[in-house]
Amino acid sequence: MTKVVLIRHGESVWNKENLFTGWADVTLSEKGIEEAKAGGAELKKAGFTFDKAYTSTLTRAIKTLNLVLEEMGLLWIPVDKCWQLNERHYGALQGLNKSQTAEKYGEDQVKIWRRSYDTPPPALEKSDERYPGHDPRYKNLSEKELPLTECLKDTVARVVPFWENVILPDIKAGKKIIIAAHGNSLRALVKYLDNISDADITELNIPTGMPLVYELDDNFKAVNKQYLGDPEAVKKAMEAVANQGKKK
């Protein structure tokens, strides 16, 4: 049985402030640093090791991965930083407070923007400083690849081919892989691995800093998954993520 580990970055400073983050590049909070270290400790305790790691081009995921690998004594393994694993782009919502946005537009609308499969938030203008085309890390991407906004369906459209064409060949070659990414890029991957319907994906929330272990069968299809750590703590963390888009 093949195993692959997914981990959402630890709490970021914008998670702490309950802001829509998307492709905005913010760092980890103190709590997020501790979450990442704890995730690494859980993996080490459970006897995991890795040959290669994948993460996004965003600081919060890269730092999380480094902290996990440091806890495990694995900072030396190769790491690929890939924009395809970035968080979904939240468009014109990036930088706005989720609770205040719920006050303005209503909780139902914010839940649709946050959790629906195919309804994107309002788009950015290309002149907006938040447009990824202004960021040097994306200078090699085509205009078509640079989002003005994204729904989860758009995120699936970049994450799943990356899994199939880049990550899965490494797994098939026998490499032990860890992926450190984001709430929605991981929701996109989990949707694919677990064959979750467009409707049911609305209720899926992924907690920060908690390793999610997938078991794959001989055909590299997911047959089991489990969070490492205390089940009650996992449940509470999922509920906290779900409540972020509600009015105060």
UniProtKB/Swiss-Prot annotation:
Molecular function (GO) terms listed? phosphoglycerate mutase activity
Biological process, per Gene Ontology? gluconeogenesis; glycolytic process
Q: In which pathway does it act?
A: Carbohydrate degradation; glycolysis; pyruvate from D-glyceraldehyde 3-phosphate: step 3/5
The UniProt keyword set, sorted, is:
Gluconeogenesis, Glycolysis, Isomerase
Q: What Enzyme Commission number(s) apply to this enzyme?
A: 5.4.2.11
**SUPFAM superfamilies for this protein:** Phosphoglycerate mutase-like (SSF53254)
Decide whether keyword Hydrolase is in the record: no
Q: Does the keyword Isomerase apply?
A: yes
The site annotation (Transition state stabilizer) covers 182
Q: Cross-referenced PROSITE patterns, in alphabetical order?
A: PG_MUTASE
- Taxonomically, which superkingdom? Bacteria
Per its UniProt entry, what is the enzyme's top EC class, as one word? Answer: isomerase
Q: Of which family is this protein a member?
A: Belongs to the phosphoglycerate mutase family. BPG-dependent PGAM subfamily.
PANTHER family, alphabetized: PHOSPHOGLYCERATE MUTASE (PTHR11931)
Its name, as the record gives it, is 2,3-bisphosphoglycerate-dependent phosphoglycerate mutase
Q: Which organism is it from?
A: Brachyspira hyodysenteriae (strain ATCC 49526 / WA1)
